[in-house]
């Protein structure tokens, strides 16, 4: 019987690759997505497609209104999504999003008896979010083992971030080898209802540059 793992699945390029890698590692993957009030809801439809295509045992979508707090261009329509690189942490950072998602994954893992959680964060070709850094992942794993019944009873809980030190091109090559159909993923911060990308935001830039560096055709559909 395969061991269970929780895989955080946004519907984007990175999380799809993380799911494929977890499956390749021999886990029965339970995919978890978060409907947090993001403007790019097309990624949730993409997550459902990817969970099915990549053999997830189960896919759940948790609704949690982080958008009620605002504070991010991804949850507040009055804040424009930047279309050029900015210094510092950009307004597309969603406060505590990865912390909340990992906490939900941890709760589900305890219920299922899973000891492994996968998250597709990256600290090489990324937008500079503080909750994508290795220090954060390491700290959350320590907390998980202190704050759970499983951890206190001696079961080692592990937070896997297999993409953390890979370039976007390396991620794309890895996922392609594992059968990820990147045409089904949505990365754009302001994708339209059909999942077509704007081609101008930071997520689109990183994705486009990644395919270019990988020497592979970019399957992204653009709105214009």
From Swiss-Prot:
The cofactors it requires, by name, are: Zn(2+)
- Record-listed ATP binding positions: 9-19
GO BP annotations of the record are: queuosine biosynthetic process
User: Which keywords describe this protein according to UniProt?
Assistant: ATP-binding, Ligase, Metal-binding, Nucleotide-binding, Queuosine biosynthesis, Zinc
Q: Which InterPro entries does the entry mention?
A: QueC, Rossmann-like_a/b/a_fold
Q: What class of enzyme is it?
A: ligase
Catalytic activity as recorded in UniProt: 7-carboxy-7-deazaguanine + NH4(+) + ATP = 7-cyano-7-deazaguanine + ADP + phosphate + H2O + H(+)
Cofactor stoichiometry and binding remark: Binds 1 zinc ion per subunit.
Report which superkingdom the organism of origin falls in. Answer: Bacteria
May I ask which residue range the UniProt record assigns to the signal sequence? none
Might you give the EC number(s) for this enzyme? 6.3.4.20
Where does this protein act, in terms of pathway?
Answer: Purine metabolism; 7-cyano-7-deazaguanine biosynthesis
- One family from Pfam that matches here is QueC
Binding site residues for Zn(2+): 188, 198, 201, 204
What role does this protein play? Answer: Catalyzes the ATP-dependent conversion of 7-carboxy-7-deazaguanine (CDG) to 7-cyano-7-deazaguanine (preQ(0)).
Q: Protein name, please?
A: 7-cyano-7-deazaguanine synthase
| Source organism per UniProt | Thiobacillus denitrificans (strain ATCC 25259 / T1)
